[in-house]
Curated annotation (Swiss-Prot):
Name of this protein: tRNA-specific 2-thiouridylase MnmA
Name of the coding gene: mnmA
UniProt-annotated stretches for the region Interaction with tRNA: 164-166
Binding site for ATP: 24-31, 50, 142
EC number: 2.8.1.13
Record bears the keyword Transmembrane: no
Amino acid sequence: MLDDFKIDLLVKNKPPTSTTAVVAMSGGVDSSVAAALLHKLGYKVIGITLQLYNNNKNSNTKGACCGSLDTKDAKQVASSMGFPHYTLNYEKVFREEVIEDFIDTYTQGKTPIPCIKCNQVIKFRDLLNATKSLGADVLVTGHYIRKIEQDDDIYVYSSKDTKKDQSYFLFATTVEQLRLLRFPLGNFHKEDIRKLAKYFNLQVANKPDSQNICFVTDTYKKTIAELRPHTIKKGNIIDINGNILSQHNGIVNFTIGQRKGIGISSKAPLYVIKLNPDTNEVTVGPKSALLQNKLYIREINWLAKEKIPHNGLNVKVKLRSSHSGSPATIFPNNNNTATILLQDSYCTVTPGQACVIYDHDRMLGGGWIC
């Protein structure tokens, strides 16, 4: 069975028995298999699970991750395989840098992706520092993404399992972080990972994939109302000409492109076109007013060695994780920003989301949509 799951050495020219690998264990099947596989291959595995919020509150939320039951699952996997496991409490920094950012972004009329922020400031910053302090050689995760090192250059590619590819969520990972990160599952398919979990007799073998944001116990609005109630205020819903159509109970209830749940009867479908936090107004209109072929991104993390030429670079862009990608041209601007011009399509542009840039299946970098 293990002959079908060959991976490159985690550290070049260093045998597994001399290599210490910290594995970030969420309690799910992917990170559990990554840890178990490396342990079976002879690596010195240390499992670490991060406690990021009040686990008891969300422990039984269907489809959520990182709850107290997930921590127990991770510990059980480590115990059954015979490698050490530790839980690190990062609740304070998670609240300050992920949850507060999530609320800030929503109240600004944007749509956040807290999982990317968590990867950026918790897993691939603080957990990497913990990895170094333990004297470990690498930090391993169960993400479906491929990384190739040639000489001193690093290339990142989408997973062979395109349905499970997670490169979109890792665009903000820096080159220096990537030097210590390893993704052993990137060349495999999810169904094969579940088979391996059963081969190892892991109790998480049939555990469903997490789909919800870990700290959201019900709805986004309810979470924001609990943590920052004063930010939810009534306001006007207007059309594209500024005419008042109705009232809303807070712009946090809306996202650009939304059609359902607007609460207005109309002969033609209405979509959320704009959210204005300054006036607390929600603008709605026809789909034609929603579609764009130009967008701007900020805080670009560029992984490719080649710079973006001033006359533009033809690329493929993904504007959401489920997006298959659209051909586009990227033009560099000042202050680590860029303009993206879609070549043959119009789409919904949602501020706060990520725009991730590819050359075929190679991830070049990305940025946040303005």
